[in-house]
A protein has these predicted regions:
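Active-site mouth of glycoside hydrolases
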Residues: 37-212, 217-227, 237, 410-413
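Short, solvent-exposed turn/loop segments enriched in Gly/Ser/Thr/Pro and often Arg
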Residues: 94-96, 133-137, 219, 350-354, ...
Length: 420
C-alpha cells in the first residue's frame, strides 16, 4: 500500500466513498477459463522487509549501504513458521526497486542474493510467496512517476529490465509468483497503463515462460480498476493471476493515518464499524479532542479541516455502511471474473486492512477494526477470492514489531488460529 497512488485517488474518494462504481463487462474468454493449481489462499503482506530505505538527499540518486533501515521489523524464520501454523499459506513481499536500480553491478548482485534468501526462507516455512515490485512514492528520485507513469518515463526501461531479471531468478523457486507493479496510478481504463503492464509482462516472459505473473487494473488496483480491465490481451502472458486491493470506505480504514496528505484523515478517529455501532456526534467529539491537542496546525486550517470532516462524516453515517457495503464492492470483482470466465481462485485481494489505535496511532477503535477485517475477509471468501492482509507489522499489522506476539483479535478476524 503506497500512499502516492492512493492519495491521488482519495481526492475524490472522500465524496464518493459510499457509491460503488459500475462497469460494463464483456463476454467470457475461453482462453482465460483455466483454473490451475495455485498455492495462494490466505496470505499476509511482509512490508517493510525490503522497504524503508536510506536514500541520500538530492541531487544524489543512490542509497547508503545497506539500503534498508536496520531498525525495520523483518520476520525471522521462527516468525514465518508461526505464521504458517496460524493457517496462512503465503506471503506477499513488497520490494522497493530503488536500491536495486541505483546500485552498481556488484551491489545489485548482493541485493538480489538478499532477496533470494528471503524467498527461500518463506518457502522453507512451507509458505508460498508473491514478490511485488512496489515503488515508493516518498522517494525523491526512484519513485513511481519516474518509473511506471508511462513507457516513456525516464527510468521505465531500467524498471522493465529489473522485472525481467527478477522473473529469471524467481523461476527456479516453487510456489512463487511475480507482481510487477503495485497500485498503478493511471485511470481505470487508461491505455497508458495497459501499455506499461504489457511491456512489463513481456519482459518477465522473456526470462521465464512458466513463472506465474500477477496482473491488475488501473485506479490504484481498486475494484473499479479491475472491473475496467480487459483480460483478453493478457492471455498471451499465461500463466497469470489477477489482483485488486480493498480499503473502502477509506474514512474507516485510513482514519488517523499520519501519512495521508488530506487534512481530514489526520485528526479523524473513533469512526465506528459498522456505522450503526456509533454516532456522528461521538465521532465529531473525538475529532475535536484530537484537533485540540494539535499544536502544529493553524486554527484556520483546523477549522477548514473540521468543516470538511463534518461533511464527509455526515455522508458516512447517513449511508450506514455495514457488511452489505463490502459485499457490493467485492461482488463487482466477482461479476467481472464470472463475465470473463475467470475462476475466482485466480483473483487475489492482494491488500486489505485498517489502521489500529495504539501507542503510536489514534485511529479506529480496535473492536471496530476487528469487525471490519472480519467482514472484508468473509466477503472475499464468499466470492471465492484468495486474500493477503495488510500488514504483518506496524499500525496495520497482526504481529508486534518488538515482542513478535500475534494479535489474537486479528488472528480471529482473519479466521486463523493462534499457533501453539
Amino acid at each position: 500500500m503506497t500512499g502516492w497512488s492512493r492519495r491521488r485517488l482519495l481526492r475524490t474518494a472522500l465524496s464518493t466513498a459510499l457509491v460503488p462504481a459500475t462497469a460494463a463487462l464483456s463476454s467470457a474468454s475461453p482462453a482465460l477459463a483455466a483454473t490451475g493449481e495455485w498455492r495462494f489462499r490466505r496470505g499476509v503482506n511482509a512490508w517493510p522487509w525490503f522497504a524503508l530505505t536510506r536514500e541520500f538527499p538530492a541531487p544524489r540518486t543512490d542509497y547508503d549501504w545497506p539500503p534498508f533501515q536496520s531498525q525495520r521489523p523483518v520476520p525471522t524464520p521462527d516468525d514465518l513458521r508461526r505464521l504458517r501454523r496460524t493457517g496462512l499459506d503465503f506471503v506477499r513481499l513488497p520490494v522497493d526497486p530503488g536500491p536495486f536500480l541505483a546500485a552498481d553491478a556488484a551491489t545489485r548482485a548482493k541485493l538480489l542474493a538478499m532477496l533470494d534468501d528471503a524467498v527461500a526462507a518463506v518457502i522453507d516455512a512451507d509458505l508460498g510467496i508473491i514478490v511485488n515490485v512496489q515503488a515508493n512514492g516518498a522517494t525523491h528520485y526512484w519513485n513511481p512517476d519516474r518509473m511506471v507513469s508511462s513507457t516513456a518515463a525516464p527510468e521505465f526501461e531500467a524498471y522493465r529490465a529489473l522485472v525481467g531479471t527478477l522473473a529469471g531468478r524467481l523461476q527456479r523457486f516453487p510456489s512463487v509468483a511475480l507482481e510487477p507493479v503495485n497500485e498503478p496510478p493511471q485511470s481505470c481504463s487508461s491505455n497508458v497503463w495497459s501499455n506499461v503492464q504489457a511491456a512489463l509482462l513481456a519482459a518477465a516472459r522473456a526470462s521465464s515462460q512458466t513463472l506465474p505473473l500477477v496482473v491488475t487494473g488501473g485506479c490504484g488496483s481498486m475494484v473499479s480498476g479491475l472491473a475496467a480491465l480487459d483480460p483478453e490481451p493478457l492471455a498471451a502472458f499465461e500463466p497469470i493471476l489477477f489482483t485488486f486491493h480493498f480499503y473502502e470506505p477509506y474514512l474507516f480504514s485510513h482514519q488517523g493515518a499520519p501519512w495521508m496528505r488530506e487534512p481530514v484523515y489526520r485528526a479523524l478517529n473513533n469512526v465506528p464499524w459498522p456505522a450503526s455501532a456509533g454516532s456522528l456526534e461521538r465521532t465529531l467529539a473525538s475529532v475535536r479532542a484530537r484537533m485540540a491537542g494539535d499544536t502544529e496546525t493553524s486554527e484556520a486550517d483546523k477549522q477548514a479541516a473540521y468543516a470538511e470532516t463534518e461533511r464527509v462524516l455526515k455522508v458516512y453515517f447517513d449511508a450506514r455502511p455495514d457488511r452489505w457495503f463490502v459485499d457490493k464492492y467485492i461482488g463487482q470483482a466477482r461479476d467481472w471474473a464470472d463475465s470473463h470466465g475467470i475462476a475466482p481462485t485466480r483473483v487475489i485481494m492482494g491488500e486489505f486492512g485498517a489502521l489500529r489505535t495504539d501507542a503510536r496511532y489514534v485511529a479506529a477503535p480496535n473492536p471496530d477494526r476487528a469487525r471490519y477485517i472480519a467482514d472484508v475477509r468473509q466477503s472475499a471468501e464468499a466470492s471465492g477470492f484468495p486474500w493477503a492482509f495488510w500488514d504483518l507489522f506496524d499500525g496495520m499489522g497482526m504481529m508486534d514489531d518488538k515482542t513478535r506476539s500475534l494479535d489474537p483479535a486479528m488472528v480471529d478476524a482473519l479466521g486463523l488460529r493462534m499457533p501453539e
